[in-house]
């Protein structure tokens, strides 16, 4: 069987040797010239080809018509690509009757794209592998001929994992190539719903953000240590590179980046601490961590972090309208952990954000967006990123106060959108999973799913269509007037500070808060229509991390994008959520402060929400955009979220009871 080979790197050498060993008639080898700016730790495909007496080429553009014609003249039966860095055109792939096959360094459909070995380490994966798949127009998306799994240990680095992948590629090809000579293999289509895509990495991506967990930072160190440029941070203007590290489960009260000790050299992280085992100063030697501290004059309580700019760089100003709300206060906390941001906020209350009021990077005014229009316009003009988070987003209000929902959620927010257009400011707008309505797709896709709502007499859809219309207006302003925007769609975010029990008492809260109130007060848990409706519950910390990356907007990756933010693996019915809450409630240390459980009570939606309500059976997000654009993946299990949310409300309820007047307690 005549083959044309496109190859580079060690895997390219493995592939070339495997084809020769399997007896393929290799007509030509295409590779790349050496890049003098690259640390070449891998073998040369050109040398292997020369040793095998094969013709080898390194064209600037292999898809040029001249090269396409030369390949046509060779009449290949099959084409192989082994870590070749450029996409092959459809015209080239059509020249081989058996098609083209690519060897990719991951277990597709996960980790499509560039640098999969580095990315799996960055993300803390415990397993990866190699995949031989048919090449199609879309990168790394073709049907699979075979895979070989590789375990990732806690101490693997990019180099050690690369060696494992090289061995795995050898085993996979030894198994598949002889069989492919005999005839076409059965191919397995990839599941697009499971696909994730990652882009190329640069040396700048090795910068350490100390507010992340020690586990996450250690994964970065492993992913970019030698032969790559390394993970790095700064002590003032001086750069230090960390080559080896160890995460420590250490409790501290220091700011992220603070040096906790110099022997061993240990640095505080957002969660835990990182021990620096070996490192290197900018002009120094590769040394042990304690020696590095001596050479660079690192002392306890000094902070490592970003390189200070020679010119004072202004912080990015973020305006959050509705800053005291659930998303607003959690987002503020995340932004203030990063020295690059300054937050301006407006809301009608301040109970949830009182912990930030002493922070010099936080500026708050108590007010109503329908009244303080001049203040809002001034601050839109002053700030860089605008997040209008004010909205009525509780289902009972959609039927109880539909006009108020329209006035606030649409009309007031439209003014803000127009001010963003007027002053050329970027808006990050909270769309909603509700816009999908009764969509009949299994997963709701931002770019292809239909937005289906009920008849006019079902007033519950006024929230959905208000948000949808704003989405369309924002999109149109982007197309016609260059408005910079990102639309994000939260799917049932949960966590501490979601609503409050007083809101639940008047029925104006989310489902979990209402369920917790029933437990706290000893009233039956009301399950609307039996609680059969399924939702995908997302931990607030997962959601906020995705939203933070949208605000960060590296290289403008989020401009003009619509991004679902949800956790498809945390799908559960409302009844299952209630049962999970009940179990956690019965096992909680404060259980004795509350009345006995009063049971479950099924209730019709019309009796609970009123006339004009209509529900949907499920609401499952596709998160391919979030994975591809943000390199984000939800991590927190639903049980943890439920436990933490319940704990927050139970402690608040106990404090409320303790503070209540005696006559009220005896009533």
UniProtKB/Swiss-Prot annotation:
Keyword match Lipid metabolism: yes
GO function term, MF aspect, one: carboxy-lyase activity
UniProt site positions, description: Transition state stabilizer: 102
Site residues, Raises pKa of active site His: 140
Catalysed transformations (reactions): UDP-alpha-D-glucuronate + NAD(+) = UDP-beta-L-threo-pentopyranos-4-ulose + CO2 + NADH; UDP-4-amino-4-deoxy-beta-L-arabinose + (6R)-10-formyltetrahydrofolate = UDP-4-deoxy-4-formamido-beta-L-arabinose + (6S)-5,6,7,8-tetrahydrofolate + H(+)
InterPro entries: Arna-like_SDR_e, Bifun_polymyxin_resist_ArnA, Epimerase_deHydtase, Formyl_trans_C, Formyl_transf_N, Formyl_transf_N_sf, Formyl_transferase-like_C_sf, Lipid_A_modif_metabolic_enz
Binding site for UDP-alpha-D-glucuronate: 393, 398, 432-433, 460, 492, 526-535, 613
One GO BP: lipid A biosynthetic process
Subunit-structure text: Homohexamer, formed by a dimer of trimers.
Name of the protein in question: Bifunctional polymyxin resistance protein ArnA
Organism the protein comes from: Yersinia pseudotuberculosis serotype I (strain IP32953)
Organism phylogeny: Bacteria, Pseudomonadati, Pseudomonadota, Gammaproteobacteria, Enterobacterales
